[in-house]
Curated annotation (Swiss-Prot):
Signal peptide start and end residues: none
Source species taxonomy: Eukaryota, Fungi, Dikarya, Ascomycota, Pezizomycotina
Compartments it resides in: Cytoplasm
Domain GS catalytic: 114-362
GO BP terms: glutamine biosynthetic process
Protein name per UniProt: Glutamine synthetase
């Protein structure tokens, strides 16, 4: 008997079981966000339909919130309300992934359900036609929480050759990145690209443009898929905004934003108006832009300082960057570079809408 079990999934052995018929039934994997900003999931059997289930056609389910930090033990049931449905790239058709909101037994949204408030803001300001695009940076770690490919008792060569790198010694775990990309495409996630990042073992994928609340839904589903894919390769995914102290880049969740008026000729006026409003609420935004962001927003490594608000054209050291092309045309979008990689996309997109267009009354 082996002294320790493998950390890898045995995907090859699993294949023959995945090919077995399901006799008119499907597996629905319900996914939710826990108290630590991670994803959890569990499965249930449902009758197969000719067309894909809509969220409102799926049953509300529940889980033990005392085991996820979302409810006390004496009143532990938390309800899962389906909000978005995706094809399952792991089990294949007709199986589905069901992104769900968390609700308390008394009919109120769970305190960690940030989607509910964001959805109200998106609905109230739908006439602005908001588009978002998020750039999710992350770091791949081994089982001992060391970045993949790093020397066990030392450090790799300084940053420089790794960003968008090609070749051994410049990138690691590209197989995870490729598998994740294909899973997102299969599931219908609006993934728009990927690249190796500045620090070795750090990668980025982009999701968007997405309309309104769809942004948070697709980013969270993409995060879930990344964790699931990484299981197959024995890797851990870290969204820590500064996983390695010192002269190494941190990890962010750069947020690109525009409205219909910003995308039209003369839209720079609306972009500048929005930036002024963002400046006035800098501290409020920082409060929901991720844990540990002070270690990343130092004014170095392509970041602005957490203590000040700046903006500029093509300036990656600013809080807000206006792309040079947009500056030249006079319309387009802007990039909020402040959010950390572990921030909740619902909170990011929600507070941007609130700051630019006003809060929603209860």
């Amino acid at each position: 008997m082996a002294s320790e079990s493998t950390i890898l999934s045995n995907a090859e052995n699993l294949k023959k079981f995945l090919r077995l018929p399901q006799n008119g039934q499907l597996i629905a994997e319900y996914i939710w966000i826990d108290s630590e900003g991670g994803t959890r999931s569990k499965s249930r059997t449902l009758p197969e339909k000719e067309s894909q289930y809509l969220p409102e056609e799926l049953p509300i389910w529940n889980f033990d919130g005392s085991s996820t930090g979302q409810a006390p033990g004496e009143n532990s049931d938390v309800y899962l309300k389906p909000v978005a449905v995706f094809p399952d790239p792991f089990r294949g058709s007709p199986n589905i992934l069901v992104l769900s909101e968390c609700w308390n037994a008394d009919g109120t949204p769970n305190k960690f359900n940030h989607r509910h408030e964001a959805a109200k803001l998106m609905e109230a300001h739908a006439d602005q036609v908001p588009w978002f695009g998020l750039e999710q940076e992350y770091t791949l770690l081994d089982i001992n929480d060391r970045p993949y490919g790093w020397p066990r008792n030392g450090f790799p060569a300084p940053q420089g050759p790794y960003y968008c790198g090609v070749g051994t010694g410049k990138v690691v775990q590209r197989d995870i990145v490729e598998a994740h990309y294909k899973c997102c495409l299969y599931a219908g996630v609006k993934i728009s690209g990927t690249n190796a990042e500045v620090m070795p073992a750090q990668w980025e994928f982009q999701v968007g443009p997405c309309d309104g609340i769809e942004m948070g839904d697709h980013l969270w589903l993409a995060r879930f898929l990344l964790h699931r894919v990484s299981e197959e390769f024995g890797a851990k995914v870290s969204f820590d905004p500064k996983p390695i102290p010192g002269d190494w880049n941190g990890a962010g969740l750069h947020t690109n934003f525009s409205t219909e008026n910003m995308r039209k000729e003369g839209g720079m006026k609306y972009i500048e108006d929005a930036i002024k409003k963002l400046e006035a609420r800098h501290k409020e935004h920082i409060a929901v832009y991720g844990e540990g962001n002070d270690k990343r927003l130092t004014g170095r490594h392509e970041t602005g300082s957490i203590d000040s608000f700046t903006y500029g054209v093509a300036n990656r050291g600013a809080s807000i960057r206006i792309p040079r092309e947009c500056g030249a045309k006079g319309y387009g979008y802007f990039e909020d570079r402040r959010p950390a990689s572990n921030a909740d996309p619902y909170q990011i997109t929600g507070i941007i809408m609130e700051t630019c267009f006003g809060a929603v009354s209860e």
